[in-house]
Amino acid sequence: MLTGGALWVDAWLWRGPMLTLAVGGLAFVLYFFRDPERTPPADALEAGIVAPADGRVVEIAEEDDPLYLEGPARRISIFLSPLDVHVNRVPARGVIEHAEYRPGDYLVAWHPKASEKNERSEFGLRHPTGTKLLFKQIAGAVARRIEYDLREGDTVETGARFGIVKFGSRMDLLVPPSVELHAKEGQVVRAGTTVLGRIPTPESGRSSSAEATAAPSASSARRSSAS
């Protein structure tokens, strides 16, 4: 009887830590796959570019993109830690003209060659103004599974969910020089809500022209008053 009781106690001593690990693991998985509601700012719905992923902007660099933009571009690289929300969102409204999955290596997500060597998916989007954007889901050393639901020909809206990269990864966004960039290196961003830039529109062009015309007129008025 004593032996049986000892075995029962011993089983519970083992079962306690195992149960704790199981509950902790389940809690982490539920936390990792959380998908909070996000609403883009009202002034970003038409011509804004929002962050396609949660994380930190680790680099903003100039480069040439022969794949889709076919010219000079500025690349915004966002690193996602395992604690960030990993649901990805479309950066701007428009039509998906390019969608391709590329198998590859699993370098750490912040490696300079990760965007060229790692497993990734690439999406080219044309905004209604004609401006083109390219964004890439890039797997890291831990994240080895990319999921997305975008196809060529899809019409998408700013901030719409489109996929996930699991357990630490990176997102690259390439924009042409004409885009007014707001992103800063080191900035912490949230997918679907943080505005990274703005696409030039005919309205913004007319506004700039009007301001440029008004400035000389004001100067002329001051000179006339002085004389």
Curated annotation (Swiss-Prot):
Membrane topology term: Peripheral membrane protein
Cellular localization per UniProt: Cell membrane
Post-translational modification: Is synthesized initially as an inactive proenzyme. Formation of the active enzyme involves a self-maturation process in which the active site pyruvoyl group is generated from an internal serine residue via an autocatalytic post-translational modification. Two non-identical subunits are generated from the proenzyme in this reaction, and the pyruvate is formed at the N-terminus of the alpha chain, which is derived from the carboxyl end of the proenzyme.
Top-rank taxon: Bacteria
Start-end of Low complexity biased regions: 206-227
Pathway named in the protein's UniProt entry: Phospholipid metabolism; phosphatidylethanolamine biosynthesis; phosphatidylethanolamine from CDP-diacylglycerol: step 2/2
Catalytic site: S169
Catalytic activity: a 1,2-diacyl-sn-glycero-3-phospho-L-serine + H(+) = a 1,2-diacyl-sn-glycero-3-phosphoethanolamine + CO2
Primary localisation category: membrane
Pfam family, one: PS_Dcarbxylase
GO terms, biological process: phosphatidylethanolamine biosynthetic process
Keyword Cell membrane: yes
Region described as Disordered: 197-227
Cofactor: pyruvate
Cofactor note as given: Binds 1 pyruvoyl group covalently per subunit.
Listed GO MF terms: phosphatidylserine decarboxylase activity
Protein name per the record: Phosphatidylserine decarboxylase proenzyme
